[in-house]
Amino acid sequence: MKVKPSVKQICDKCKVIRRNGRVMVICENPRHKQRQG
């Protein structure tokens, strides 16, 4: 999980979602998991 000030989609399978007021990227590639914070 990368924590970044700005999250971006890295590949076509990445999805930007909101969870508990946090913006997150989920992907089938675990290296692409990101959270804004």
UniProtKB/Swiss-Prot annotation:
GO terms for biological process: translation. Keywords: Ribonucleoprotein, Ribosomal protein. SUPFAM superfamilies: Ribosomal protein L36 (SSF57840). One of its GO terms (cellular component) is cytoplasm. PROSITE patterns: RIBOSOMAL_L36. Transmembrane segments: none annotated. The keyword Ribosomal protein applies. Pfam families: Ribosomal_L36 (PF00444). One of its GO terms (molecular function) is structural constituent of ribosome. NCBIfam families: rpmJ_bact. Belongs to the bacterial ribosomal protein bL36 family. This is Large ribosomal subunit protein bL36B.
